[in-house]
Amino acid sequence: MFIRALYLMLIALLIPFYLQAAMTISGTRIIFPASEKEVNIRTNNRGDKPALVQVWTDDGKVNGDVNSVKTPFILTPPVYRVEPGRGQSVRLIYNGTALPKDRESVFWFNMLEIPPKEQGVANNKNKLELAFRTRIKIFYRPSSLTESSEEQVEKLKWSVKSASNGSKLVSIENPTPYFFSFDSAAVKNGSIGADINIDMVPPFTRLEFPVKNSPSVTNNITAIDFRSINDYGAAHQHHLIWQNQAFILKDPTPQS
């Protein structure tokens, strides 16, 4: 019994290195304009076996009960089967629940891929089956917001402060009605950098993020590099320099 359990644990540890989900979502985020009643989400089966899929939305609680989570969206179909090499469009329908009109709201789209039962194979207690879950953000954008977050990136206010333990924190103030997501960020001292443990910054908020300890960098921070993510999921590189007691956006001039 112990050897069998140990064997299964070993297999579970090795699985992430060679298994991946067959089902994919077209895009890494969903922009839902308030002017639309619904948007379509394309899902595709890139595997060689049929896939059973369940989809739902949530408000950010990763482990919340699917049946009790309340969001202003309806998904149809909520459960479906996709043959190998085929796709399925899912309708994301806004149910009319009142949402703020002066800022974006964020929710999550979830897709759970359930592996099919192999026909003709006897039940095997040692067989390990995995279900793959994918989550992407849904940004509900009021009609009054006519630009994208990327067009507002220069309005973010960055600063650096010291925590009580001596480590550095990067503060980001977002005075805009848009959510800002980041691929990466780092403080710089010349050519040397230290990563910032950055996360999404909601509208009209200020958040602080810790910097990876690196005294050669954090004792003299002269710049900040970051990659913001636009509406299409693409990352854009930005560069801030310390000038006149503030971090100023100094992106390179685009090449013609």
Task: Kindly give the residue locations of the regions a language model identified.
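Short, hydrophobic/aromatic beta-strand segments
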Residues: 49-57, 179-186, 238
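Intrinsically disordered, low-complexity Pro/Gly/Ser/Thr-rich segments with frequent PxxP/GP/PP motifs
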Residues: 64-98, 190-218
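Beta-sheet-dominated interaction scaffolds and their linkers
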Residues: 21-44, 148-165
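Terminal connector regions
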Residues: 95-146, 216-256
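Asparagine-centered strand-capping/turn motif at beta-strand->loop junctions
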Residues: 41-47, 170-176
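Short, basic/aromatic beta-hairpin or loop at an interaction surface
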Residues: 59-69, 182-187
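Sec-dependent signal peptide recognition
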Residues: 2-11
